[in-house]
Amino acid sequence: MEPIKNLPRLGRILGYQFQQIALLEQALTHRSAASKHNERLEFLGDSILSIVISDALYHQFPKATEGDLSRMRATLVCGKMLAEIAKEFKLGDYLKLGPGELKSGGFRRESILADAMEAIIGAIYLDADIETCRTLVLNWYKSRLAVIEPVNQKDPKTLLQEHLQGFKQPLPVYTVVNISGEAHAQTFTVECKVEQLKEAVIGVANSRRKAEQIAAAEVLERIKK
């Protein structure tokens, strides 16, 4: 495979210049492209990201409960958030993907972008140390840490369940009513039924979980009117 171009430029964008540039190249290599891919680095980066964000939240919110801290952390380290950061860095321009992933637009896929961000954190840890990782991660997350609050971190499914339980209502029933598209780009249609609404509410997304959350959010909005 040809080397990835413009890695020093990516280093400047990230705010870190690698001593071992091969680590950055490996962090950007999807398993579809080479045997020496980024999954082990992703494993490292996932753990480092979790401890850095956990520590930041612990000190930022001294009165927050364990549950609140866990929910805020989940919001900040989720794949969607990591993919947003990756897009800010235009990380898709630097990914090394196999022919199949290239053809299917893998450089735009949230899961691939998120995994690469975690792998980069793991690569920086091996190239430097955890304190360097901490400084960089906190800089990347600065604006997000500034606005996150202990409230409203529960996902729509949890909020809907708690709302119904508070009124001693039966729990919602979620049913997948349709799955379309090819295996790498499926679309899920899920309906959510609750006793308070005559008709089921539909959610559509690229995963069952997301579709359920969309449906739950719509149900919440309707029953609270």
Swiss-Prot record:
Record domain RNase III: where: 7-129
GO terms of molecular function: double-stranded RNA binding; metal ion binding; ribonuclease III activity; rRNA binding
Main localization of the protein described in the UniProt heading: cytoplasm
Annotated GO biological process: mRNA processing; regulation of gene expression; rRNA processing; tRNA processing
PANTHER family with a match to the protein in the record: RIBONUCLEASE 3, RIBONUCLEASE III
Role of this protein: Digests double-stranded RNA. Involved in the processing of primary rRNA transcript to yield the immediate precursors to the large and small rRNAs (23S and 16S). Processes some mRNAs, and tRNAs when they are encoded in the rRNA operon. Processes pre-crRNA and tracrRNA of type II CRISPR loci if present in the organism.
Protein name: Ribonuclease 3
Organism name: Shewanella loihica (strain ATCC BAA-1088 / PV-4)
GN (gene name): rnc
